[in-house]
Structures are given as structure tokens and as C-alpha cells.
Regions:
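Active-site-adjacent beta->alpha loops and helix N-cap segments on the catalytic face
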Residues: 11-26, 44-51, 66-84, 97-102, ...
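Surface-exposed amphipathic alpha-helices with a cationic face
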Residues: 23-28, 57, 78-82, 132-149, ...
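Glycine-enriched alpha-helix->loop->beta-strand junction motifs that scaffold or abut catalytic
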Residues: 56-62, 80-89, 106-114, 172-176
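C-terminal helical cap(s) of enzyme catalytic domains, especially alpha/beta-barrels
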Residues: 1-4, 183-216
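Catalytic cores of alpha/beta
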Residues: 96-106, 156, 160-177
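Hydrophobic faces of well-ordered beta-strands that scaffold small-molecule active sites
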Residues: 35-39, 64-66, 88-92, 112-114, ...
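Glycine-rich phosphate-binding active-site loops on the catalytic face of alpha/beta enzymes
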Residues: 59-65, 69-73, 114-123, 159, ...
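Conserved, mostly hydrophobic/aromatic
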Residues: 56, 104, 138, 169, ...
Length: 216
């Protein structure tokens, strides 16, 4: 689904420069809204790491999720991003070893992105027990060691598409959720009716936000 959205965006003439222009418009309207973009390292590399990060910061981006850069090769990226005040969340999956999780957490800033399930992105009807076991394990490791100077927020993503899912994740102890495929699906469904699209997106976000705020 995300890949299909990527192709559609490219066909519509969207590129990194246009994305930065869109972010700039959002930032002017919402000055306090945290904005973390997701991209591939190839874009940063081809456009000049420092140059692109600086332009991104100036447009209003607060950080990047770069899923295809391994922690063994991320020192330059993390260093340059840190100089500009950009956060660098990294991803941890259910099969990430404890030693590697410590390394990932030590290089992450802003938050740690915990992948909820094995497989690819997309909407799921339910989550397995291992999802919640892994969340508890991640919290244990982060809180029981000096991995970071202060406990880093844990955000979980992949497959979350209902308020009930959001509540389950928050009940398990995470600090936030990431929802993507559900929104992409609604954009695709109503792409010829902008008013309807915006109304549906607002309804989804509002219901997720409400579920998160209802946590004790």
C-alpha cells in the first residue's frame, strides 16, 4: 500500500524539493507541531547530506526516520543531524537482539520506533502476543540500563488502524503510535474528492488521538 502511494506521488510530480515546500507551508500554520519525515538514505546522500539536512531543518522538519541505514554506518548522519538539532529515531523489530537494541537506542534521539510485527507494513486485524512481549522487553532494557541519558520515548508502528489498536498499544506501555496505511487507504479511496478525503482523515486522526488521550 505504501509502495503504491509512492508510485502515485511520483506520477503526480512529487519530489523531495516539493515535499520540503509542503512542510514549509505546514510549519507556517502549525509552529509547534513536531514534524518527523521518513526517507531513504540515498536521497540524503545524493543531495549532499549536510546540505539537504540543513534545507530540511530550515523548512520546518524536526528530524528523519531513515529505515535503510544500519547503525554501523550512521555516525556521520547522526552527527550532522545532531548539529542542526534534528532528531534521529531508529527502528527496532521484534527479533532485534538485546545487544543490538542497546546500540539502536543509544543512537536514537526523539524516540525509538518499535516495529509491532513481523512482515511488511499494512493494516492488521489483530496483534500476536509477541508484539506486547516485545514492547515490555524493550521498555525493560531501556529503563534498566544507562543506554540513554534519559528514558527515550517508545513509539510503536506497523498495522495500527483502529482506536482499539491504539488503546492496546498505549496500555502496553508505549508513549505513542504511528498510523500510516489506514490514512493512505483513505487518501486512495477519496483521492477524487478532496473534501471527503480531508473529512475522513480528520475523523481517523481524531479517533486515534481520543483513544490515546483516554489512557490513565
Amino acid at each position: 500500500m505504501i509502495q503504491e502511494a509512492l508510485y502515485q506521488s511520483l506520477n503526480n510530480g512529487i519530489n523531495p524539493d516539493e515535499c520540503l515546500r509542503i512542510v514549509s507551508k505546514i510549519r507556517k500554520k502549525f509552529s509547534e507541531l513536531p514534524i518527523v519525515a521518513i526517507t531513504y538514505y540515498n536521497i540524503l546522500y545524493k543531495r549532499g547530506l549536510n546540505s539537504f539536512l540543513e534545507r530540511s531543518m530550515e523548512s520546518g522538519i524536526d528530524g528523519f526516520i531513515v529505515p535503510d541505514i544500519p547503525i554501523e554506518h550512521c555516525n556521520e548522519y547522526v552527527s550532522e543531524a545532531s548539529k542542526l538539532g534534528l532528531v534521529t529515531p531508529f527502528l527496532a523489530s521484534p527479533n532485534t537482539s538485546e545487544s543490538r537494541l542497546r546500540s539502536i537506542a543509544s543512537m536514537s534521539s526523539g524516540f525509538l520506533y518499535v516495529i509491532s510485527a513481523y512482515g511488511t507494513t499494512g493494516m492488521r486485524k489483530s496483534f500476536e502476543k509477541y508484539t506486547f512481549d516485545n514492547i515490555r522487553n524493550v521498555k525493560r532494557i531501556i529503563n534498566s540500563t544507562n543506554v540513554t541519558t534519559s528514558p527515550i520515548p517508545i513509539i510503536v508502528g506497523f498495522g495500527i488502524n483502529t482506536p482499539q489498536h491504539a488503546k492496546l498499544m498505549l496500555d502496553s506501555g508505549v508513549d505513542g503510535i504511528i498510523v500510516a496505511s489506514k490514512l493512505v487507504d483513505k487518501i486512495k479511496e477519496s483521492r477524487n474528492n478532496e473534501a471527503q478525503m480531508l473529512q475522513q482523515i480528520k475523523a481517523i486522526v481524531s479517533s486515534m488521538k481520543k483513544a490515546c488521550k483516554e489512557q490513565p
